[in-house]
């Protein structure tokens, strides 16, 4: 059974978790090691149009932010955005079995690369199962309020899985 103490995380889930929870402490409570590829670190610092989540990301000193760019395989580089490609490449390089990616194509390629995949909703559900005090409905609403895109299928699944169906 692969260890679920280590995870490599992409940009979108980092931003989604800050939107849902207000910080990244949930990751610290679930994982011994949370690695952030250099490429993801750069994407976060650029901050999109709003700069959302930069302060929370920088204050999470326990995150293992990689200090140098990766050499990414041409297959990953040509198939995915830089963040997703770097998450999968770092996982393969460091023999870490679990990655956190929200985008469908990145998730598919991670699985084809032999990796276990979770996403921002998967992390929230695991936290709830392990006793972290949170409402999945509230977390999802906060994500939607910050323009995090979630399909109705994912929302319905998460609420049902969390036992929060009405």
Predicted regions and their residues:
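Hydrophobic alpha-helical interaction segments
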Residues: 119-163
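Active-site-proximal, substrate-binding regions of enzyme catalytic domains
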Residues: 2-97, 104-107, 111-115, 138, ...
